[in-house]
Amino acid sequence: MTDSTYDVARVRTYLQGLQTRIADALGALDGTPLATDTWQRGPAERLRGGGCTRILEGGRVFERAGIGFSDVAGDALPPSASAARPQLAGRGFEALGVSLVLHPRNPYCPTVHMNVRMLIATKPGEAPVFWFGGGMDLTPVYGFEDDARHFHQTCKDALDPFGIELYPRFKQWCDEYFFLKHRNETRGIGGIFFDDFSEPGFERSFDLMQSVGDAFLHAYLPIVERRAELPYGERERDFQAYRRGRYVEFNLVFDRGTLFGLQSGGRTESILMSMPPVANWRYNWQPEPGSAEARLYSDFLVPRDWV
């Protein structure tokens, strides 16, 4: 985070285009266009700036699909952003990014999350400090090994041009980040996660972020197309709602992006669009031994080398 030469306008243009491309692809797949909610912060609010939320609820394929773009600025980095960088505490900041969470209707079709972002910390009389972050991760209710391999291979292909050491590094980071400590289980089968990234300078770091963003549809759409029409019943929907409870727990307790948004006075509707439309909890529930539900825990909710 030492190179202070950057181009926010190019990053903004890319992110807005990425949101549109993904929203158009999801709307075409579902048969229902995503609604558009453009928003702007008021002059008396803690944050300045605005954004655009693309949202689909009650669709044929997606029970909820939300893709948010935001570009906001504030007077002081929130604790979730400066905890690992105490030297930046109290600096002004600009944060822009695209974040999405898709909750399919069919329990055999996995939930997915993707985010790409840039942050700039500023202080009068000192050079700005920028960094990139992002990644994508897959959260199946019923695990399929070919889906996991495809998702991870696509992530690896997106990173390999920037160094073959990055995929294993970002995969491990993802496995460690998306972990529910109080449950002692991973949120899903992982993917890639990175933060505080500016080592190669602006151009190369921006290229990497674009490669991750551009890989998302290739990583996820083939899985949806394979699984969205599989038959299912009440048992599968009940287990889906139970597993979605874990998603809620992670997002509200651990997720850095959710905490950043809430701590900085972000737009609550956009921050919480990642929540599943239906979730439930059961006291001390255990899957039936040998069942497909049990196999999720034994074979998929543990870190594995998928490629």
UniProtKB/Swiss-Prot annotation:
Renumbered residue ranges of the record's region Important for dimerization: 247-282
Cofactor: a divalent metal cation
Alphabetized InterPro entries for the sequence: Coprogen_oxidase_aer, Coprogen_oxidase_aer_sf, Coprogen_oxidase_CS
Reaction catalysis annotation: coproporphyrinogen III + O2 + 2 H(+) = protoporphyrinogen IX + 2 CO2 + 2 H2O
Source species, domain of life: Bacteria
GO CC term (a single one): cytoplasm
Main location: cytoplasm
Chain positions recorded as a divalent metal cation binding sites: 103, 113, 152, 182
Annotated Pfam families: Coprogen_oxidas
One Gene Ontology biological process: protoporphyrinogen IX biosynthetic process
Subcellular location: Cytoplasm
Catalytic-site annotation from UniProt: 113 (proton donor)
Main EC class the enzyme belongs to: oxidoreductase
Listed Gene3D superfamilies: Coproporphyrinogen III oxidase, aerobic (3.40.1500.10)
Keyword Cytoplasm in annotation: yes
Site feature (Important for dimerization) residues: 182
Function recorded in the entry: Involved in the heme biosynthesis. Catalyzes the aerobic oxidative decarboxylation of propionate groups of rings A and B of coproporphyrinogen-III to yield the vinyl groups in protoporphyrinogen-IX.
Subunit architecture: Homodimer.
Name of the featured protein: Oxygen-dependent coproporphyrinogen-III oxidase
Organism the protein comes from: Burkholderia cenocepacia (strain ATCC BAA-245 / DSM 16553 / LMG 16656 / NCTC 13227 / J2315 / CF5610)
Gene: hemF
